[in-house]
């Protein structure tokens, strides 16, 4: 079984472009759930460029599946997570100047801080995931922090400019997923996945969940939000079924 986490950040981006109350990220999340989303992902960035603080509690109370909060490794974000108590937290690297998350968390470099955050979040019943590059040493370090989940960064695969590079990156993702599962980790993946490139990743049996946002929101402008979610989920399920 492959799960779909729908990232609703860019619904908030559209809302914030005009400073209005619409479109509502919460309404989008509820539509996504009815269309087959298994969880809702949102990223409260330090610059609040899309999701705002007020969105968190409303989202937590409204959705019926799981809330996956992406957050930077800062005390402010830890406090927010401990206040809202999402079911899941994914710790991600963050740079103010980037358009979107550009790479994986350096777990080896920030090991002690990550382990401390992980302990505090888990003490409140929150499942902790670390967003990392598909690298053996980062996976092993992630396991040693006490985190039970890793999310593999698929950006290099998604942005590959040639078939050979794409296949090389897919092999890295597949190998990393096997390493993670062998260590007892739950392995998720995401970043840059679209309707055109999702199936090879969804076919990797060791991967439990894919988190996808921009492609779904963009496609929703043409076909509607629920159909966009259903189409993505169908592609994922088809790929996993064919790989079985």
Curated annotation (Swiss-Prot):
Record bears the keyword Cytoplasm = yes
Name the positions where 3-amino-2-oxopropyl phosphate binds.
7, 18, 192, 213-214
Q: Can you name one GO molecular function term for this protein?
A: pyridoxine 5'-phosphate synthase activity
Q: Which UniProt keywords apply?
A: Cytoplasm, Pyridoxine biosynthesis, Transferase
List of catalytic residues: 43, 70, 191
Q: Provide the protein's localization.
A: Cytoplasm
Q: Name one GO cellular component term.
A: cytosol
Q: Which family does it belong to?
A: Belongs to the PNP synthase family.
Functionally, this protein is described as follows:
Catalyzes the complicated ring closure reaction between the two acyclic compounds 1-deoxy-D-xylulose-5-phosphate (DXP) and 3-amino-2-oxopropyl phosphate (1-amino-acetone-3-phosphate or AAP) to form pyridoxine 5'-phosphate (PNP) and inorganic phosphate.
The annotated subunit structure for this chain is:
Homooctamer; tetramer of dimers.
PANTHER family annotated for this entry?
A: PYRIDOXINE 5'-PHOSPHATE SYNTHASE
What HAMAP family is this protein classified in?
PdxJ (MF_00279)
What name does UniProt use for this protein?
Pyridoxine 5'-phosphate synthase
